[in-house]
Regions:
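SAM-dependent methyltransferases
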Residues: 2-11, 204-212
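Glycine-rich phosphate/pyrophosphate-binding loop and the adjoining helix
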Residues: 188-212
Length: 212
């Protein structure tokens, strides 16, 4: 990997530090689907879209070591700044350790994420002045996919710091401070008709459902 001072156009940020109570003692990102950890599936599907910068945000050095031992590929590990703080902690750490202008931000549990959809999101933000491109299921109800979205680094970093300073820890509060293009998911169906790209694994039962 290049060092953190090297600028690049695209980066991938994968948030792996969250604890999932529904997975009990298991670490969700290392839970196995069809022979590979969920995190491995996720990295393998998106890394080629931004091969110069893939960052995995882990909750601590213990999890980081486990990831390093079990996951292959060219990626860097950063550690959440705060304990039990939700996705903002890992996202803040990752954005402070990269110089990429635009970053895809995703969870570690998206084994079917579509790299062509990711490419589409990067193309939209590169051709615009928006701070973020966030897929949207329903604008009125605010059903968004903020953990399957592309963000411009600088304004997003500022927004995260503002939100944390206000005592909040929700990613939706960050999105609310940004100039966001809400991309209707129907515009993605031409690439991914069934929108499998948004499938995330929340429970062991869902994991079992996708085994083959």
């Amino acid at each position: 990997m290049g060092d953190k001072d090297k600028s690049c156009g695209r980066g991938i940020v994968i948030l792996a530090g969250g604890k999932s109570e529904r997975f009990q003692s298991q670490d969700k990102c290392l839970s196995t689907l069809n022979g590979l950890p969920l995190l491995q599936h996720t990295i393998d599907r998106v890394a080629w879209v931004a091969p110069n910068e893939v960052i995995v945000a882990a909750r601590d050095s213990e999890q980081g070591e486990e990831i390093r031992n079990r996951i292959t590929g060219d990626f860097r590990i950063v550690f959440d700044y705060f304990t039990d703080f939700g996705p903002l902690s890992g996202l803040l750490a990752a954005l402070e350790h990269t110089r990429c202008y635009h970053c895809l931000v995703i969870g570690c549990d998206m084994p079917f994420i579509n790299p062509e959809v990711v490419e589409f999101l990067f193309d939209i933000i590169a051709a615009s002045r928006y701070d973020a491109v966030v897929p949207c299921w329903d604008r009125e109800s605010g059903m968004l996919e903020p953990l399957h979205a592309v963000y411009r680094r600088e304004p997003t970093l500022s927004a995260i710091k503002n939100v944390i300073k206000e005592g909040n820890r929700r990613l939706s509060n960050v999105v609310a401070q940004l100039d966001v293009y809400l991309l209707p998911v129907d515009k993605i169906r031409g690439i991914d008709p069934d929108l499998k790209t948004f499938t995330n694994i929340n429970t062991p039962a869902e994991l079992e459902l996708h085994h083959h």
